[in-house]
């Protein structure tokens, strides 16, 4: 009896499972739109899972972190290219003068290659060009740069600030040439005035040819109506500027004695 009841229950279970079963053959001609209807709940549940959401958030954060430095590097590279373009355009403006300077003075040409680092060239082009013209007429400054770089830099600063350079460039050039002779002559004048007078003789052609006329010319220098020798006049002006020279900064007491010695000689 019990065996019959179990067999009947098994038959009922098979009947119910057979009526509710849905079989899709492998070679079925059913449209592909029906298949996602059965897969949609599974996929939606998979995307809504916390692990999947955390992974997607991590990927988004990693992408944003990696893209930010790349953008910054691109901006920096663009700014660097812009600066290089501006510097190249400024250098092209001075290329004709630099090519001539390369033939005349290669050392000065190498110094002019750093135009972008020169504040005077960027701030005032006219003053920079004037300074370059003055440097062409001052070969003594290039020699001074090799012997004493500190004094050369100080001389370059005085070029843009001296009113004599702006007003009268030839007088300034003559003054610069005389400055090479003045330190040795002033020391000689303090040590030995007689030797100082003899040292001045080679600089005056009139002294070599006619000593009497030379003495007469020295007396005429005291007369403001007389026509003086330009070289001697420039030298007298240089004697008046001695308190402002480097010699006066080193020894102020001896600097105040220089006009007295010059006045006694001339």
Curated annotation (Swiss-Prot):
UniProt keywords (A-Z) are:
Seed storage protein, Signal, Storage protein
The molecular function GO annotations come to: nutrient reservoir activity
Coiled-coil intervals in this record? none
- Kindly indicate where the leader peptide sits in this chain: 1-21
Q: What does this protein do?
A: Zeins are major seed storage proteins.
Q: Member of which family?
A: Belongs to the zein family.
* Something else known: The alpha zeins of 19 kDa and 22 kDa account for 70% of the total zein fraction. They are encoded by a large multigene family.
State the name under which the record lists this protein. 22 kDa alpha-zein 8
């Amino acid at each position: 009896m019990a065996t019959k009841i179990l067999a009947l229950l098994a038959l009922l279970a098979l009947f119910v499972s057979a009526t509710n079963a849905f079989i899709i053959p492998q070679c079925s001609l059913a449209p592909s739109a029906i298949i996602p209807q059965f897969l949609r709940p599974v996929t939606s549940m998979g995307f809504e899972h916390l692990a999947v959401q955390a992974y997607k958030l991590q990927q988004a954060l990693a992408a944003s972190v990696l893209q930010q430095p790349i953008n910054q590097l691109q901006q920096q590279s663009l700014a660097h290219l812009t600066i290089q373009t501006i510097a190249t355009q400024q250098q092209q403006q001075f290329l004709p003068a630099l090519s001539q300077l390369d033939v005349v003075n290669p050392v000065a040409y190498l110094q002019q290659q750093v135009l972008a680092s020169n504040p005077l060239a960027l701030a005032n082009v006219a003053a920079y060009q004037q300074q370059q013209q003055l440097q062409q007429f001052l070969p003594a400054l290039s020699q001074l740069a090799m012997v004493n770089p500190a004094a050369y830099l100080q001389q370059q600063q005085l070029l843009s600030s001296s009113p004599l350079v702006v007003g009268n460039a030839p007088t300034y050039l003559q003054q610069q040439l005389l400055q090479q002779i003045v330190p040795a002559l002033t020391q000689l004048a303090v040590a030995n005035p007689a030797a100082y007078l003899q040292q001045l003789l080679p600089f005056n052609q009139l002294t070599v040819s006619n000593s009497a006329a030379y003495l007469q010319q020295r007396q005429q220098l005291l007369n403001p109506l007389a026509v003086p020798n330009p070289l001697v006049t420039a030298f007298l002006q240089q004697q008046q500027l001695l308190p402002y020279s480097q010699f006066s900064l080193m020894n102020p007491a001896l600097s105040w004695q220089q006009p007295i010695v010059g006045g006694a000689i001339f």
